[in-house]
Curated annotation (Swiss-Prot):
Role according to the record: Catalyzes the condensation of (S)-aspartate-beta-semialdehyde [(S)-ASA] and pyruvate to 4-hydroxy-tetrahydrodipicolinate (HTPA).
Family the entry assigns: Belongs to the DapA family.
Organism (species): Methanococcus maripaludis (strain DSM 14266 / JCM 13030 / NBRC 101832 / S2 / LL)
Listed pathway(s): Amino-acid biosynthesis; L-lysine biosynthesis via DAP pathway; (S)-tetrahydrodipicolinate from L-aspartate: step 3/4
Site, Part of a proton relay during catalysis: residue positions: 42, 105
Root EC class: lyase
InterPro entries: Aldolase_TIM, DapA, DapA-like, Schiff_base-form_aldolases_AS, Schiff_base-form_aldolases_CS
Stated name of the protein: 4-hydroxy-tetrahydrodipicolinate synthase
GO cellular component, one term: cytoplasm
Residues at which pyruvate binds: 43, 200
Primary localization class, coarse: cytoplasm
Enzyme Commission designation: 4.3.3.7
PROSITE patterns (UniProt xref): DHDPS_1, DHDPS_2
């Protein structure tokens, strides 16, 4: 895996999934050069989608993409059997891979993680991207565990690494050849400089062309050019997490007239003070017309 993989939002209209809007957003991203799309992850509000909505969104994304780029579906859960079942469903409807978050809340041991991911890997054939996000799960996939999983299971091929500690990335890449994608827009360039391949991006939902250019420059070793884009987008990157994701990105997309819609509780609208900051950042980048 290499390049920019937007973690796409799930657009809503009157509290129902807006599939026409979803198609439009996907076409926009593909036209601007992304390597793939990642539906029903954190940014896609997966915790508040019903199981049927979750499945239908994945099915529709595969249909709308129609083989033009990769589809890596979020299929993780803190229940191994549930994650396995949804991963099998996603494979059946034609995804190119699955993204499996570390089980949250029940906080398994590293041995439990090995068994959790291993059981799923043995049950599907498509590539698996491990998703390490300790800030949400209160659990880190230790480098030794990642090394074990990569060496033991041929379809565990990548990690979305959202641990801000770059020592983690260094330790992983020093021990095995697994592909690492940054799980944090702000850390994309540092992670690529250490040997990472790209990013699962939030900001790419609204600035895909620029982010693809930045990552392409970085992967080609042209870091001076990549840094120019990084610093141009950096204020907006920070604002994407001024409140809980996906509140800022959905707010920005609404401001830009893109299909986005409301959020589902317990997420709610952005504070007015933060909306103003976001509006100013979009204006400064020339994104607001």
């Amino acid at each position: 895996m290499q390049g920019v993989y937007p973690a796409i939002i799930t657009p809503l209209k009157e509290n129902k999934v807006d599939y026409d809007g979803l198609r439009n957003n996907i076409d926009f991203l593909i036209e601007n050069g992304v390597s793939g799309v990642i539906p029903v992850g954190t940014t896609g509000e997966s915790p508040t989608l019903t199981p049927l909505e979750h499945e239908k969104v994945v099915e529709k994304v595969v249909e709308f993409v129609d083989g033009r780029v990769e589809v890596i579906a979020g299929t993780g859960s803190n229940s191994t059997s549930e994650a396995l079942e949804f991963s099998q469903y996603a494979e059946d409807v034609g995804v190119d891979g699955v993204l499996l978050i570390t089980p949250y809340y029940n906080k398994p041991t590293q041995e439990g993680l090995k068994r959790h991911f291993g059981e799923i890997a043995n049950s599907i054939n498509v590539p698996i991207v491990l998703y390490n996000v300790p800030s949400r799960t209160a659990l880190n996939i230790e480098p030794e565990t990642i090394k074990y999983l990569f060496n033991e299971y041929s379809n565990i091929s990548a990690v979305k690494e959202a641990n801000p500690n770059l020592s983690q990335v260094s330790e992983v890449l020093d021990s095995c050849d697994i592909d690492i994608l940054s799980g944090n827009d702000e850390l994309t360039l540092p992670i690529i400089s250490l040997g990472g391949k790209g990013v699962v991006s939030v900001i790419a939902n609204i600035a895909p062309k620029e982010f693809v250019q930045m990552v392409d420059f970085a992967n080609a070793g042209k870091f001076d050019k990549a840094k120019e884009i990084h610093y141009k987008l950096f204020p907006l990157m920070k604002l994407m997490f001024v409140e809980t994701n996906p509140i800022p990105i959905k707010t920005a997309m609404n401001m830009l007239g893109m299909p986005s819609g409301e959020l589902r509780l317990p997420l709610c609208e952005m504070a007015e003070s933060n909306k103003l900051k976001l509006q100013n950042a979009l204006n400064n980048l020339g994104l607001l017309k």
